[in-house]
UniProtKB/Swiss-Prot annotation:
<dbReference type="GO" id="GO:0070006">
    <property type="term" value="F:metalloaminopeptidase activity"/>
</dbReference>
<feature type="binding site">
    <location>
        <position position="555"/>
    </location>
    <ligand>
        <name>Mn(2+) 1</name>
    </ligand>
</feature>
<dbReference type="InterPro" id="IPR000994">
    <property type="entry name" value="Pept_M24"/>
</dbReference>
<dbReference type="InterPro" id="IPR036005">
    <property type="entry name" value="Creatinase/aminopeptidase-like"/>
</dbReference>
<feature type="binding site">
    <location>
        <position position="541"/>
    </location>
    <ligand>
        <name>Mn(2+) 1</name>
    </ligand>
</feature>
<dbReference type="Pfam" id="PF01321">
    <property type="entry name" value="Creatinase_N"/>
</dbReference>
<keyword id="KW-0031">Aminopeptidase</keyword>
<feature type="binding site">
    <location>
        <position position="555"/>
    </location>
    <ligand>
        <name>Mn(2+) 2</name>
    </ligand>
</feature>
<comment type="similarity">
    <text>Belongs to the peptidase M24B family.</text>
</comment>
<keyword id="KW-0464">Manganese</keyword>
<dbReference type="Pfam" id="PF16188">
    <property type="entry name" value="Peptidase_M24_C"/>
</dbReference>
<feature type="binding site">
    <location>
        <position position="443"/>
    </location>
    <ligand>
        <name>Mn(2+) 1</name>
    </ligand>
</feature>
<dbReference type="GO" id="GO:0005737">
    <property type="term" value="C:cytoplasm"/>
</dbReference>
<dbReference type="InterPro" id="IPR029149">
    <property type="entry name" value="Creatin/AminoP/Spt16_N"/>
</dbReference>
<comment type="function">
    <text>Catalyzes the removal of a penultimate prolyl residue from the N-termini of peptides.</text>
</comment>
<feature type="binding site">
    <location>
        <position position="443"/>
    </location>
    <ligand>
        <name>Mn(2+) 2</name>
    </ligand>
</feature>
<dbReference type="InterPro" id="IPR032416">
    <property type="entry name" value="Peptidase_M24_C"/>
</dbReference>
Amino acid sequence: MTILRHPLRFLFKPRFLYFQSPSGQSSRPFSTSQILRTALDMPPPPVDTTQRLAKLRELMAQNKVDVYTFISSFTGSAGCAIVSMSKAALSTDGRYFSQAAKQLDSNWTLLKRGVEGVPTWEEWTAEQAENGKVVGVDPSLITAADARKLSQTLKTTGGSLIGIDQNLIDAVWGDERPARPSNQITVQPVERAGKSFEEKVEDLRKELAAKKRSAMVISTLDEIAWLFNLRGSDIPYNPVFFSYAIVTPSVAELYVDENKLSPEARKHLEGKVVLKPYESIFQASKALAESKASASSGSGGKFLLSNKASWSVSLALGGEQNVVEVRSPITDAKAIKNEVELEGFRKCHIRDGAALIEYFAWLENALIKEGAKLDEVDGANKLFEIRKKYDHFVGNSFDTISSTGANGATIHYKPEKSTCAVIDPKAMYLCDSGGQYLDGTTDTTRTLHFGEPTEFQKKAYALVLKGHISIDNAIFPKGTTGYAIDSFARQHLWKEGLDYLHGTGHGVGSFLNVHEGPMGIGSRAQYAEVPLSASNVLSNEPGYYEDGNFGIRLENLVICKEVKTPHKFGDKPFLGFEYITLVPFCQKLLDASLLTEAERKWVNDYHAKVWEKTSPFFEKDELTTNWLKRETQPI
């Protein structure tokens, strides 16, 4: 199995995007368009993958492999493809059932994850590996834990798992595979990071000492960027760079292409971090393992490794006998923002809110007053141009989801100029977008209607808004997980027999990845593992989607914080949320009669704050001021 986003997309001839494995190390740029068709109105036919699969199967035969498995993750989510000598399957979750059903050609079977009676991808793979067949994976693209799990599953049907150092998808790709990017690495100054990298490294060393570990090998890109207060742009929308790192009690090593370091970055690291060639990480890991093996009995400890690190890194360090796999302490530390980072989040959300307000005012005027014919890409491009005007803007934090009508029901829809729909002023319009700013990262979704919504659309909007408000108002004891509060967002939909097939909230980085862990809010088991903590930044984004008709999602970012309560049961602190996104909800979709008095007060208080914080940007912009005044009026 290959945990990587590009192989599946290569088989399907994707658009130009970069994707990364969980550790981020095997990301490659590629060209994405045909099979990943995105329009629901007149979708082009699926790309015929017959020849690509045939080439892959030739290589499988040469490597004496009966089944080849690899993971494909869309932005912020996951899918898995498995190819045997006669069959091919794609497993994905509810966010992509509709999209995948439209995009797969006849060579592929869709495995709907979580649906009763449908096998998991591991079970399906085991079925193909019956009677001694061999399953091959690229060990650099699967975690050690996932490799062990898959191996155990295969044994139940008599199959076996082997690692293949050559990535067979790359071999099929051949010369068409673009080169790895080599963009400049810059410093995130302590004035914005809130803590020096020397302090962060020292904190990690204390963690190693407490756990009696001799070193930590770090392979997750946003962890490395955060740890060393550096930022890059090797992966679009994510300010990270291709690298590895090793931290011991006495030395910090960064494995990176030195030519990418800006003069400022070199000075930043000089005398404190040893620079090593990116490609030498596996040799260095093996040397660590050999050094441990030759050391006298009892000296040193096992190596600390993230449970998201690749199987190949674990093997280079000597495998389970030398490695302890844990949730990375860097991930935990990164998720708890310091006061400088939190203030940056608050400030960048005021500017980003102003940009979205300006965009929505422009869009309504263009569609309704001017009668302009604008497609979904035109809208996304205009929003980007508006954001660029605001201070400290670096770029988008993900592909803008600009979707009209039925396209809004595809949860992670991405419009393409050749196939996207014209924005229909008589239909719902869902816009999910975000920006990367030097002082923070944003992610906001609003659903609007420029005409006359139906009564059901207004009711569905109210149910989603009620869930959004329920999360925003939640108060819970320290130690509570996002799994425990997820139902707060869904309860109003459930009473009507409705639901949505995605999580309610994800962590967000500080001028880093717009999706980060380890915490989140959702109904999957993973959300029950890590409690929410004060100073986490998360999204609050319930939704509702009606295939072939419309989608609704309402998303703010929130800061988890300690709150005052009349009592303190068990002497435990209680936590709640502070919203930082400042964009009005759609007046045409707001039906005050469907909200309680407390909910109406929440909306009115929210809109008053939106007006207070963003209206000063539009003192010389009558169009936007009038739109904002109308959209923030009390209900």
